[in-house]
């Protein structure tokens, strides 16, 4: 059985992304944020602005997000059952914090060929203009 609806699959095919997909409850997202804060306190030198990669490898709580069935089922609906997680990144942008990430395509930075893979972006807080919301651009996947 396919997790994503035919409309969602068509949106992915036509626009290059699907949004939103409800993955975590508010309480699950809060637990994940608290886990990240705990890791930052325990490992302040390792988890700085440049070292927020693959933290799921040291945290079972964050690893559970990587293996969340809703994420995996959605990914499987797009690319099939053969799924490999290459990396995870914590991108933390607090309200009114300085910093900017320009528009980009993940394929440029990931470096995998062919481009038959997906990125699952999971928000642990509300994404809005005060904290630098995520914007998806249609048709740039073509």
How would you label these PLM feature ranges?
Residues 89, 105, 122-126, 138:
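Short, structured patches in soluble enzyme cores that scaffold and shape functional sites
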Residues 17-19, 119-123, 133:
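Conserved hydrophobic/aromatic beta-strand scaffold that supports enzyme active sites
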Residues 1-112:
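Non-heme Fe(II)-dependent double-stranded beta-helix
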Residues 111-129:
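Short, conserved beta-strand element in jelly-roll/cupin
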Residues 140-142:
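Conserved small/polar residues in nucleotide/adenosyl-binding loops
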Residues 21, 137-138:
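Residue-level detector of conserved, well-ordered beta-strand and adjacent loop positions
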């Amino acid at each position: 059985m396919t997790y994503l609806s035919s409309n969602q699959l068509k949106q992915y095919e036509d626009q290059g992304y699907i949004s939103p997909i409800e993955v975590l409850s508010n309480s699950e997202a809060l637990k994940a944020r608290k886990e990240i804060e705990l890791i930052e306190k325990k490992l302040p030198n390792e988890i700085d602005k440049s070292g927020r990669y693959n933290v799921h490898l040291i945290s079972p709580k964050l690893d559970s997000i990587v293996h969340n069935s809703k994420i995996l089922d959605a990914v499987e609906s797009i690319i099939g059952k053969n799924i490999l997680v290459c990396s995870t990144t914590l991108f933390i942008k607090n309200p009114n914090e300085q910093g900017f990430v320009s528009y980009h395509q993940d394929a440029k930075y990931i470096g995998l060929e062919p481009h038959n893979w997906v990125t699952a972006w999971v928000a642990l807080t509300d994404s809005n203009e005060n904290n630098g919301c995520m914007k998806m651009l249609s048709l740039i996947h073509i």
